[in-house]
Amino acid sequence: MMTPKNLFERRKRRARQSIKKKGNGRIRLSVFRSGKNIYVQVIDDLNGVTLAAASTLDKELKGNLKTGADKEAAAAVGKLIAERAKAAGITEVVFDRGGYIYHGRVKALADAAREGGLSF
C-alpha cells in the first residue's frame, strides 16, 4: 500500500525527470511548501549553485504578512523572487513544483513570479 509520503516522492520524481528532459540545462525555479511557510529558490543545476532565494521568513515580507501559509503570502514571495532573479540577470526559468499539485499556494506563487517578469 502506498503511503502519502511515497505518493509525494513518486510525483516529485516524475516532475523532476520531466524537467531534466525538457529543461535543456535551463535555470530551475524550485518550490518548497511547508504548513507555515513557502520557500522558493532559483537554482543552476549545471554549476550546482543557488542564484536567488526568497521565502515568507524574509525580513522584507515577514512583518507585512499576517501568516506565511496563505495565497497572499505565496504571491508576495513570487513577486520577491522575480525581483531578485531579474537583479541577478535571470528572466527565463523552468518551474519545478516538486511533488506539489499546481494549485493554491503553488499556483499563486507561479502567477506572481510571471507577473514580476519571469517566463516559464
Swiss-Prot record:
Pfam families: Ribosomal_L18p (PF00861). The keyword Ribonucleoprotein applies. One of its GO terms (molecular function) is structural constituent of ribosome. Keywords: Ribonucleoprotein, Ribosomal protein, RNA-binding, rRNA-binding. One of its GO terms (cellular component) is cytosolic large ribosomal subunit. It comes from the Bacteria. The keyword Transmembrane helix does not apply. CDD domains: Ribosomal_L18_L5e. InterPro entries: Ribosomal_uL18_bac-type, Ribosomal_uL18_bac/euk. GO terms for biological process: translation. Part of the 50S ribosomal subunit; part of the 5S rRNA/L5/L18/L25 subcomplex. Contacts the 5S and 23S rRNAs. Belongs to the universal ribosomal protein uL18 family. This is one of the proteins that bind and probably mediate the attachment of the 5S RNA into the large ribosomal subunit, where it forms part of the central protuberance. This is Large ribosomal subunit protein uL18. It comes from Paramagnetospirillum magneticum (strain ATCC 700264 / AMB-1) (Magnetospirillum magneticum).
